[in-house]
From Swiss-Prot:
Enzyme class: translocase
Family: Belongs to the ATPase alpha/beta chains family.
Annotated Gene Ontology cellular component terms: plasma membrane-derived thylakoid membrane; proton-transporting ATP synthase complex
Catalyses which reaction(s): ATP + H2O + 4 H(+)(in) = ADP + phosphate + 5 H(+)(out)
Subcellular compartments: Cellular thylakoid membrane
Name the UniProt record assigns to this protein: ATP synthase subunit beta
UniProt keyword annotation of Iron present: no
Species this protein is from: Prochlorococcus marinus (strain MIT 9215)
Gene: atpD
Subunit-structure text: F-type ATPases have 2 components, CF(1) - the catalytic core - and CF(0) - the membrane proton channel. CF(1) has five subunits: alpha(3), beta(3), gamma(1), delta(1), epsilon(1). CF(0) has four main subunits: a(1), b(1), b'(1) and c(9-12).
EC number: 7.1.2.2
InterPro entries (UniProt xref): AAA+_ATPase (IPR003593), ATP-synt_VA_C (IPR055190), ATP_synth_F1_bsu (IPR005722), ATPase_a/bsu_AS (IPR020003), ATPase_alpha/beta_chains (IPR050053), ATPase_F1/V1/A1_a/bsu_N (IPR004100), ATPase_F1/V1/A1_a/bsu_N_sf (IPR036121), ATPase_F1/V1/A1_a/bsu_nucl-bd (IPR000194)
Superkingdom assignment: Bacteria
Presence of keyword Translocase: yes
Pfam families membership: ATP-synt_ab, ATP-synt_ab_N, ATP-synt_VA_C
Amino acid sequence: MVATPSTSSQTKGVVRQVIGPVLDVEFPAGKLPKILNALRIEAKNPAGQDIALTAEVQQLLGDHRVRAVAMSGTDGLVRGMEAIDTGAPISVPVGEATLGRIFNVLGEPVDEQGPVNTKDTAPIHRAAPKLTDLETKPKVFETGIKVIDLLAPYRQGGKVGLFGGAGVGKTVLIQELINNIAKEHGGVSVFGGVGERTREGNDLYEEFKESGVINADDLTQSKVALCFGQMNEPPGARMRVGLSALTMAEHFRDVNKQDVLLFVDNIFRFVQAGSEVSALLGRMPSAVGYQPTLGTDVGELQERITSTLEGSITSIQAVYVPADDLTDPAPATTFAHLDATTVLARALAAKGIYPAVDPLDSTSTMLQPSVVGDEHYKTARAVQSTLQRYKELQDIIAILGLDELSEEDRLTVDRARKIEKFLSQPFFVAEIFTGMSGKYVKLEDTIAGFNMILSGELDDLPEQAFYLVGNIDEVKAKAEKINSEK
């Protein structure tokens, strides 16, 4: 959905050059569109088919020309076609009418459910909230996932990064978080699918319908709005769809005064699209081929995701890590903006520990006694130190064997292996694959369970009893079952 001014105020230009998704458009002298304005091209291609294309102005070239990036394919576009300056940035629909619907970068519904029943729209480009409007009191956000709530708790109104290479479970973790938050907190979510697989978007939509997050019979009862710019779309769409989703979330926060969840999958694809656009616009590449404006591009998106005195946006962003290298400029730049990082490790996934969250690499600014309390803090640190000691002993075990360790170290290894197994958990959204019912574990149960392992109360239980269960009661029940089968 693009702002359409009255006919009298429209300025018309002519397409002079088309190179892939980049257009050069010539306008009358003194009537050049502003940077970030949307241009609209509606014409017929040489085969007689309709073309309806929106492009965003990126550069003013001189000689009355502007360079714009197309938000959809430019097939059939030819020089000489008319382009209209809409006089405003791209705008998207906002409010309750967006819930249960799927949109593209322009805010056009793509779910074949008819037009969106709202006149409320908002431009995708706007300033971040003022410093005086920000809420600064820290508050923990319970997810029901043991490893996250204990070792890297999320902040309400904070920004969380899910870091991991290909195929370690970022999208499944996001789906589980949306499911848990909709059911336990009853909150509204906005999902931004940025440059990911179309199949995953379709699976997510079907999953939401099955779990009731989207109510197919009465869309007004739905809890999520979805905005997609997938892998097959031009870089302009992938670069801007994150802003479209964020604009919808901002309306729920600022106008409806709600606490909103914004999921972005994947923030790396946003950077990647920016890099493609930057190269197409002729800018000199920076480190590892990224755009020279990498820090600015990421900052403009991230600074709008925040808590104000009116409401909060808690953002959970999947971050693909190229070649599992956390020092790559894209994940490294994203790190600077985050309150918590959940790092997914391939080594844990290979062991069958799901979610494959690395308990030593994952961090959170919330894990301090003044925020989470002494008991939580001490338990988390004791778990991490036990796992760290186990990691240090692994080389010795590999060379000399377990029998060469001291009694104390053997006990540490035994408890660490139980902790590692207990950090796994069956997910609601993975029930179809695992055949196990999902578990939501309350924070107090999580802390109590790990305290019992650390204190030695459960030393006599078999290790496999701790694998893929919810709380300690389930561990004991599973242990009894294992013992009875022997």
